[in-house]
């Protein structure tokens, strides 16, 4: 019995050591990640390890895992425009590391490569591009400015083996003086538009009055010619038409009775029969 216990004890120690060695030699690379191997004898190996379970030599080697999925990052800076106006800009950058360059990225920058590189090159490119435009141009040509920033920033990031999937301006503000000047300009433009509308309306009314006056003058001239040609006949026709209109109006009123006299004098009688 004692011999069996001694044998079990002697086997337990190597078995525990073996299990520990086996566990330390196995590592997992999760989905969306890649790994590089650092060897104490040869340094960082050039091979990039894909997803899955892998083995290494304990103590001599260790794995460094990188997240290779696209990640967002904001880059903010305050700089001067071409006309010396202060501009505050914020960029939203979607970035990821170049997978095949992970060993070089780890050697030169480490796992926090994005923290070391993106703010630096982002500020550099923003200041360089903004300095080429006036403050007003940054507003009116925002799309062109964004494209210039995106193009230059992609080139700079590629030098560090970082791929940029998207670059966009999410925030742009100016100094108080420029903002106030823009507001005053907008107010002046609105006042000018309002004044132009008033002038156009007055001109339209004037033209309408001219046309109306010309029409009345032509009508008066036509009537004068008709009277001169036909004598009092036209005047009598107009009187009859006016009497007919009055009769139609009074007929619609149940409280009034209209009685033509039938006399030569042309007088009529109105009777109020209202209740």
UniProtKB/Swiss-Prot annotation:
Q: Which GO terms describe its molecular function?
A: mitochondrion autophagosome adaptor activity
State if Mitochondrion is listed as a keyword.
Answer: yes
Which InterPro entries does its entry note?
Band_7, Band_7/SPFH_dom_sf, Prohibitin
Which keywords does the record carry? Membrane, Mitochondrion, Mitochondrion inner membrane
Indicate where this protein resides in the cell.
Mitochondrion inner membrane
Motif AIM: residue span? 106-109
Asked if Oxidoreductase is a keyword of the record, the answer is no
Among Pfam families, the record links this protein to: Band_7
Q: Which GO terms describe its biological process?
A: inner mitochondrial membrane organization; mitochondrion inheritance; mitophagy; negative regulation of proteolysis; protein folding
GO CC, any one term: mitochondrion
Give the disruption phenotype, in one or two sentences. Abrogates mitophagy. Defective morphogenesis of mitochondrial cristae; cells are sensitive to menadione (generates reactive oxygen species in the mitochondrion) and the mitochondrial membrane potential is affected. Decreases formation of secondary hyphae; double knockout with PHB2 exacerbates the effect. Decreases virulence on A.thaliana. No vegetative growth or conidiation phenotype.
Q: Which family does it belong to?
A: Belongs to the prohibitin family.
Can you say what this protein is called? Prohibitin-1
> From which source organism is this entry?
Colletotrichum higginsianum (strain IMI 349063)
